[in-house]
């Protein structure tokens, strides 16, 4: 066996991949929310000061903090979009299960329809046989048409 330089990890199960993705997204979400809270807290602190000399620098800092909050909010929206895409595009097990369930439903419906058709066919055969017996044993049966003229 050649083990030189190739440290390939064993394939991960779907659960491990989902858990890893969940942790990754959770860290990103926590980071963005902390940025939002920190910037909001700092804006509140700055807005309490009413010193005319510091107003220009504090206004600039408030604008910067607001910009940071917007960036963090946009980051959260991007994470949400990624989560939705990840869920939609990579949830093959749910899609496969849904297809399997629909397949079972259609097979059951097919079996039910086939049984129903078979019962109708048998009933039709019995009724036709009864009608034939009644006709051939009837005293009102018309004689066969004569072809001599």
From Swiss-Prot:
UniProt-recorded Gene Ontology molecular function terms: transcription coregulator activity
Annotated localization: Nucleus
Disulphide bond pairs: none
GO terms under cellular component: core mediator complex; mediator complex
Protein's UniProt keywords contain Nucleus: yes
Homology family: Belongs to the Mediator complex subunit 22 family.
Summary of the function given for this chain in its UniProt record: Component of the Mediator complex, a coactivator involved in the regulated transcription of nearly all RNA polymerase II-dependent genes. Mediator functions as a bridge to convey information from gene-specific regulatory proteins to the basal RNA polymerase II transcription machinery. Mediator is recruited to promoters by direct interactions with regulatory proteins and serves as a scaffold for the assembly of a functional preinitiation complex with RNA polymerase II and the general transcription factors.
Subunit-structure text: Component of the Mediator complex.
Protein name: Putative mediator of RNA polymerase II transcription subunit 22
Organism in which the protein naturally occurs: Dictyostelium discoideum (Social amoeba)
């Amino acid at each position: 066996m050649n083990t030189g330089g190739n440290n390939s990890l064993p394939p991960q199960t779907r659960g491990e991949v989902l858990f890893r993705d969940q942790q990754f997204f959770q860290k990103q979400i926590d980071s963005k929310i902390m940025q939002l809270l920190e910037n909001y807290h700092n804006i509140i602190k700055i807005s309490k000061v009413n010193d005319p000399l510091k107003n220009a620098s504090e206004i600039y800092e408030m604008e910067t903090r607001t910009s940071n909050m917007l960036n963090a909010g946009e980051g959260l929206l991007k994470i949400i979009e990624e989560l939705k895409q990840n869920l939609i595009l990579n949830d093959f097990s749910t899609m496969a299960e849904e297809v399997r369930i629909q397949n079972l439903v259609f097979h059951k419906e097919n079996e039910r329809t086939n049984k129903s058709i078979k019962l109708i066919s048998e009933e039709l055969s019995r009724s036709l046989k009864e009608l034939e017996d009644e006709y051939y044993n009837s005293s009102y049966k018309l004689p066969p048409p004569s072809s001599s003229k």
